[in-house]
Amino acid sequence: MKRILKAISILLLAFLVGCSGTKEETKVYTKQQKGVTMELTFYYKGDKVVKQTSKNTIVYADLGLTKEQVKKQLDPVAKKYQGIEGLEDKLDFQETQVVENLTIDYTKAKLSQLKGIPGITIEAEDGQDVSMKKSEELLKQQGFTEKK
């Protein structure tokens, strides 16, 4: 009986130690400029960004363009996002706007592959972590505000 209790205690201790790691947190940043609303969500542990999502909404009329004109401009760019591990991009062309949902899983993506893609800015190199602190500084320089 003592052996069973001891084994259970060791398993519980191992489980608690495993769960006591840095908790994943999120921060959301937004920016609006003519015809475009951007919302970036960062998932991070400590200073390490593990995932980033971006929801971009583009209103055709605000840009003075039609749905077809915007589609013609965005489709070739979206093709560059395809087939890259850790990167997922979806465009939803609606009647009055297009909504882009972009996800970067930094635990799977190779940063060197992401750097050559239009619209993606990364300061880190392969093998390095994407820093939440540096990301925040860059976003603030670009006019993003944190959504609380």
Kindly label every feature range from the protein language model:
Residues 15-18:
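C-terminal motif of bacterial Sec signal peptides marking the signal peptidase cleavage site
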Residues 22-148:
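Subset-of-secretome marker
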